[in-house]
Every structure is written in structure tokens, then in C-alpha cells.
Regions:
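Conserved ABC ATPase "signature" region
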Residues: 1-18, 69, 117
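Conserved catalytic motifs of ABC-family nucleotide-binding domains
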Residues: 43
């Protein structure tokens, strides 16, 4: 059964022309897709993505955002840690901003993007979601 699931995940996440490539030969976006596919082999209810938008080009960011939305629609919870706030807030239902090791603020993307304290301490005064 795992072999069938693994094969399906490879088909869903990895383009056929790179399936036999070694990990070091993959681009950043291709590596992220592979990391996500690997995390799904155990059929989890939640996955953790650590810095999924770091070091990838804008097209790959959109691709990974689409994958995350697909996972959400399949009722797979996704916990993201990332410093790329704009990319992360644009796809989250609820977010937590940490400051000095503590939760500074939590809420919807719109709430956080408009919160004066969040802007002053973390996001920057000119931060906007659009």
C-alpha cells in the first residue's frame, strides 16, 4: 500500500523528467515539493513546513502556496514557520507572530497586517498584504 501511495505522491508532486535525479540536482522549488511529498507518505493529519518559501523563486512560491492550499482543502493541517511574512500570511487561516520568544499577536492575516503593535515590533510600519 505504501508503495502505491509513494508512487502517487511522486506523480502528483514531482515532474516526470526529474524523478530519477539526486536531491542535490534539484532546484529549491523542486526540493520543497519533494519534502512535502515525503511528509505525506505517512498519511498525516498535520505537517510542519519549516521555511518553505526560503531560497525559491516567485513561481515556486506560488506553486508551494497552491500545494499548501490543496492540503488545507484535504483537511491536512499545515504548520508553517517562515520569515517570509507576506507569502505566509497570504495563505494562512490563522497566524502567530513571535517576538522575543513569546507570542506577540495572533489572528487572521488581515488583523495582523493592520495591528499597530505587530507593525511596530515585527512587520514594519509600511507593511501591507497586497
Amino acid at each position: 500500500m505504501k508503495k502505491i501511495l509513494t508512487s502517487k505522491l511522486l506523480t502528483d508532486f514531482i515532474e516526470s523528467h526529474i524523478r530519477n535525479n539526486k536531491g542535490f540536482a534539484l532546484s529549491g522549488g523542486e526540493r520543497r515539493r519533494l519534502e512535502i511529498a515525503r511528509s505525506l507518505v505517512t498519511d498525516p493529519s498535520f505537517i510542519l513546513l519549516d521555511e518553505p518559501f526560503a531560497g525559491i523563486d516567485p513561481i515556486a512560491v506560488e506553486d508551494i502556496q497552491g500545494i499548501i492550499n490543496t492540503l488545507k482543502n484535504k483537511n491536512i493541517g499545515v504548520l508553517i514557520t517562515d520569515h517570509n511574512v507576506r507569502e505566509t500570511l497570504s495563505i494562512t487561516d490563522r497566524s502567530y507572530l513571535l517576538f522575543n520568544g513569546q507570542i506577540l499577536k495572533s489572528g487572521t492575516s488581515e488583523f495582523l497586517a493592520n495591528d499597530k503593535e505587530a507593525k511596530r515590533l515585527y512587520l514594519g510600519e509600511k507593511f501591507r498584504l497586497d
